Swiss-Prot record:
Species of provenance: Bacillus pumilus (strain SAFR-032)
Protein name: tRNA (guanine-N(1)-)-methyltransferase
Function: Specifically methylates guanosine-37 in various tRNAs.
InterPro entries xref list: Alpha/beta_knot_MTases (IPR029028), tRNA_m1G_MeTrfase_C_sf (IPR023148), tRNA_m1G_MeTrfase_TrmD (IPR002649), tRNA_m1G_MTases_N (IPR029026), tRNA_MeTrfase_TRMD/TRM10 (IPR016009)
Residue positions binding S-adenosyl-L-methionine: 113, 133-138
Length: 244
């Protein structure tokens, strides 16, 4: 997979793209990153990329020209047309399901904006997806783009050490993940549940599933309604939990 980031602040990506899973993914040649300062595409003599909004109002708006030229240049150099993603508060709420969808692509391109917003022609004529990571405001699109890229890259084949790791993550099954414990079994009187020390794998899996259901029900009940993996027994157990 290839991932392009169009940004005015390329230095923001240096640490993230060269650390942890993203670094390992590049070493395994599962992904390559290309960080592009789209200011370089500005046709203004001072390389200006923003201007005042027509009709007045506060803030500055990113101009269409440098973004269009950057996207067109990178797309023309690509072997396949990329999925072009605009990260913005107005976009579709990002989910694990969306991450799995994007992980099937060969080429992603993120447009990371700043200022008040984008010239609407960018949104209407360039992008294939608009994505939001939540109902809050950030200074720019760089952090959301990096978050999305991280969640996508870890789904690529052979990136994680244990291939099943991402399947067991929260949201991959439609539920929050169960609690985890490690050594020592007793820390200052705080003990690991006995079932995890029993060696009975069937009982352990049953405990993990119930804890996952319980945690999801108490913290994110909205996910229970959309979960399609519940058995009839689990539905009865949740009903009992609800009535307790």
């Amino acid at each position: 997979m290839k991932i392009d980031f169009l940004t005015l602040f390329p230095e923001m990506f240096e640490g993230v793209l060269h650390s942890s899973i993203l670094k390992k993914a590049q070493e395994k040649e599962a992904v390559s990153f290309n960080v592009v300062n789209f200011r370089e595409y500005s046709d203004h003599k001072h390389k200006t990329v923003d201007d005042y909004p027509y009709g007045g109002g506060a803030g500055m708006v990113l101009k269409a020209q440098p973004v269009f030229d950057a996207v067109e240049d990178l797309t023309n150099k690509a072997s396949k047309k990329p999925r072009i993603i605009l990260v913005c508060p107005q976009g579709e709420r990002y989910t694990q399901k969306k991450a799995e969808e994007l992980a099937k692509e060969e080429h992603l391109m993120f447009i990371c904006g700043h200022y008040e917003g984008y010239d609407e022609r960018i949104r209407e004529h360039l992008v294939t997806d608009e994505i939001s990571i939540g109902d809050f405001v950030l200074t720019g699109g760089e952090l959301p783009a990096m978050m999305i890229a991280d969640s996508v890259v870890r789904l690529l084949p052979h990136v994680l050490g244990k291939e099943a790791s991402h399947i067991e993550d929260s949201f991959s099954t439609g539920l929050l993940e169960h609690p985890h414990y490690t050594r020592p079994a007793d820390y200052k009187g705080l003990k690991v549940p006995d079932v995890l020390l029993s060696g009975n794998h069937a009982k352990i899996e049953e405990w993990r599933r119930k804890e996952s259901l319980k945690r999801t029900y108490t913290r994110r009940p909205d996910l229970i309604d959309s979960c399609k993996t519940l058995t009839e027994e689990e539905k009865r157990w949740l009903w009992q939990l609800h009535n307790d």
